[in-house]
């Protein structure tokens, strides 16, 4: 079967051409190793190996070559390993059950010859052929992973394998002259083409374990680890890397991270330095910690899928725009530092623009050419004043923005808790600070150019100089500008063409002063600091500002205040007049109501007197009677006022209810036959039909009708006790038809 004999102490599995038998042996030993605590363990250290000296490495190289030749002669043929199962069998040797456990490989690391001698001592029953075959197999595996020699002719890499605290014979096959222990080893494969004819330049071998402990070479969902054999590029060697990952995707991600951040030129840097950088980058991602570290320590090589995607992204035409956009809004500090580095390396005058570039020429012009004319100097002076105003405005706007942002942060923190707004506002504040800084630098550069043209050397360093003895560059510049203006006005250096005589102050200055006046309308008295600031903003002197405010308070502010007071007094007078008119109207209305009431009472009284004096002998029709009853009902309140009068006994005072006429008519209809009867109301005070007042007592009752009784009773007045007349005193008229 191509499997060498094994002893109780050490088991060496060599797979030649049959995958089936080796998979069964792998399953057996893999199951045995799982009960012993896993295939192999890793410590938490990540140390670099100590490089041995040149003499020791040369001796070991000669020893390996000699033993390889002896094993090839003794064994007859060198066992050939297939790429599919070779690495999986390498890392599945069971621990020795006999004297092999007495070997403590973690305490001391021996050389190749010492390890092989101990191996031969632990296998006394092995014959010469088996021993030679085992030695050849051991050297074959050892040559696959040699220690890193330092001489230039050797094609070995820079990393070396180290042994671990494990009882497996894998460490016997992989000796190392170094002394320290580590985890996540990276093994390099440097076999020649005649030793491994079927070995490719880049191979990936995986060992897998399913829950039912059956080994599947291709269709398994649970992957224990990955082994990557990668080509290192121009060095001509191959690199072997180990990683503990759940799938090959994690290893591909780690390779992608390494290629993105460090590129193909990362082989020039030391692996230890790369590891430190990558460890700080992925400090919080504990899930991919082990697999990423292994992939990072491996030799740099471009993976097919990840590097293709990265190259597509890098070569895209949208990459530059996206990077600028991200640097503008996300990577604020890094972009600013990049620009500073580029400016310092390539062109130190990029920020200043034309100002920085023209400073030597302006200095040369000042030296070679005559100074500026008065008109040009005045123009540059105005420009300098405007730039100073802009600089002040930028500072004021930035302070205002910071205050507004702080208000928003405070309100958000009150609702969500302290520090809740920091992740959202910190980036915005940095971005806005960067914008304001760029704007301020541009204004400062233009101001520096103007100052250099004017010959103000002290003011040229306005953006860089600091506080000296209580004075600032702005105050010094202000003082110089005021001195120059005063000197120009006094000495008469200004030409008439450049400074035409004008009436009053400039309109821009007047607008600034007027705006300040209206902002402080309640107290238009600027302090000394306000006068200095206004003088700097308007380009005027302090005396001009003071005189303007004196005149403005007299000519503008005082008339406006007086006009406001006059308007208020007029409005008050109008309100008082309206109130008086309303009161007069109310009094007039009340008087009119009283007069109308008295007039109504008088008219009612006269009407009653006249009706009492005129006898009624005719009865109107039913409608006239109803109207008369209604008018009597309406005037009963007025008539009640005269109940105490002598004639009140003859007048009706009230009715039983509002429906009295209807009740009276119903009563008459029930008593006197309905349609044949009629009623009339008449008040008689004098004689009626030949009867005198003496014959009429109280209320006179007049009865008309065609009934057999022929009586119609009409009552005038109330039915008080003693107010009803006797039956004998009633006046009856019989046999009268309809009137």
Swiss-Prot record:
UniProt cross-references to PROSITE patterns, sorted A to Z: HOMEOBOX_1, HOMEOBOX_2
Bias kind Acidic residues: ranges: 576-585
Intracellular or extracellular location(s): Nucleus
UniProt feature, compositional bias: Basic and acidic residues: 586-596
Disulfide linkage: none
InterPro entries to which the protein is assigned, alphabetical: HD (IPR001356), Homeodomain-like_sf (IPR009057), KN_HD (IPR008422), POX_dom (IPR006563), TALE_homeobox (IPR050224)
Low complexity: bias regions: 179-190, 597-627
GO molecular-function term, one example from the UniProt record: DNA-binding transcription factor activity
Stored SMART domains: HOX, POX
Keywords for the protein's UniProt record, in alphabetical order: DNA-binding, Homeobox, Nucleus, Transcription, Transcription regulation
DNA-binding region(s), chain positions: 498-560
Record GO cellular component, one term: nucleus
Oligomeric and partner information: May form heterodimeric complexes with TALE/KNOX proteins STM, KNAT1/BP, KNAT2 and KNAT5. Interacts with OFP1, OFP2, OFP4 and OFP5. Interacts with KNATM, isoform KNATM-B.
Domain remark from Swiss-Prot or TrEMBL: The SR/KY and BELL domains are responsive for the interaction between the TALE/BELL proteins and the TALE/KNOX proteins.
Family membership noted in the UniProt record: Belongs to the TALE/BELL homeobox family.
Protein known as: BEL1-like homeodomain protein 2
Organism: Arabidopsis thaliana
Species lineage: Eukaryota, Viridiplantae, Streptophyta, Embryophyta, Tracheophyta
